[in-house]
Amino acid sequence: MQYLKPISVFSEIGRLKRVLLHRPGEELENLTPSIMQRLLFDDIPYLEVARQEHNAFADILRNNGVEVVYIEDLISETISQCDSVKDQFISQFIFEAGIRTENKTQALKDYFYNMSVNDMISKMIAGVTRDDLKNYKSDSLNFLVNSEYPLIVDPMPNILFTRDPFASIGHGVTINRMQTRVRRRETIFAEYIFKYHPIYRDNVPIWYTRDEDTTLEGGDELVLSRDVLAIGISERTESESVEKVARKLFQQKTSFSTILAFQIPQSRAYMHLDTVFTQIDHTTFTSFISDDMKFTIYALTYDLGSGSIKVKSEKAKLEDILGFYLGSKVNMIKCAGGDLIHGAREQWNDGANTLAIAPGEVIVYFRNHVTNRLLEEFGIKVYKMPSSELSRGRGGPRCMSMPLIREDI
């Protein structure tokens, strides 16, 4: 379906029309206990079941009128348009995979060029093993010293979480600089899609690029309304990045008049702002915080006269902050009702990380039964997806999706 703008996201809850996903692939099969921590996984999901669960996720979306787009298809369409773009993409991917020797670079180029574009993209995500390049021999010191390491190019298992590499804001996007080196290759795909894909090139303003020197991740970016954007200052996103995004949005005269920077704890439990709260209805949010916990927030606004950004700081309860800037009292539904045992367990399994597909309609993990029951009692329509394997990646339905089109509310 064609839309007036290829990116249009002015809320967290407007009816979802088009969404970007990545279906788990062989990258999960290349995770091993010795490298999973470095690749930001706490456990190894079973691929066959993870795919079944992800298919169920996509089916829920499609059954509710959402067009599902897969990132591997978008990037394949992008680089198939022009041989020079494909050549450039392959060279950049190999370089950013840490390959520096001429012989190994050429061996990988030959390997990738002998595949279809779709198979090549799948293999880039899955990782390249020594067995894949059986004919490649090297007497370099680095190759010999690391002879027991089975991978030449590491897998990209975190690309499952399409929320983070770029973020849709209004009619534009931020193409993010990821905090961890192992995730930075993921944003190459977004860079090429928005630069060369016929639907997106020349039609999508870029609010932030992956070449910036400060970090920003999509899990910290929440579009609260046409006027208000929230960004977390977190373990993964730096305060300087918030200012850069704010300045771009203000200078380009977008509808966003206030950027709220939330300073959250620097810990894995609060990895991104969407682990602290997500919006599920006009005035209803899920959260994983205590009633008396106060946040330091910084409200960034623009002075048209001087062309400068004004920053006002305040410390208040989350519900008071959201209520003030949204203009109405809000309701906070705590993960598992705030129960010390159920709340901690269900937060670990992303009980508060919901994906709104329309106001008052959310996709959740089936396993978080206490939180799900509370949502239903509150009148929220809950679509439950299986998650025994996907939850091992420590990301919920919101983490695994990037809205491209939402209806206005």
Curated annotation (Swiss-Prot):
Coiled-coil positions: none
GO cellular component, one term: cytoplasm
The EC number(s) this enzyme carries: 3.5.3.6
Cited InterPro entries: Arg_deiminase
Pfam families, A to Z: ADI (PF02274)
GO process terms (BP): arginine catabolic process to ornithine; arginine deiminase pathway
Entry annotation: catalytic residues: C399 (amidino-cysteine intermediate)
Reactions this protein catalyses: L-arginine + H2O = L-citrulline + NH4(+)
Keywords (A to Z) from UniProt: Arginine metabolism, Cytoplasm, Hydrolase
Cellular compartments annotated: Cytoplasm
Molecular function via GO: arginine deiminase activity
Domain of life, source organism: Bacteria
Pathway: Amino-acid degradation; L-arginine degradation via ADI pathway; carbamoyl phosphate from L-arginine: step 1/2
NCBIfam families the record matches: arcA, PRK01388.1
Similarity comment text for this entry: Belongs to the arginine deiminase family.
Protein name listed in UniProt: Arginine deiminase
Origin species: Borrelia turicatae (strain 91E135)
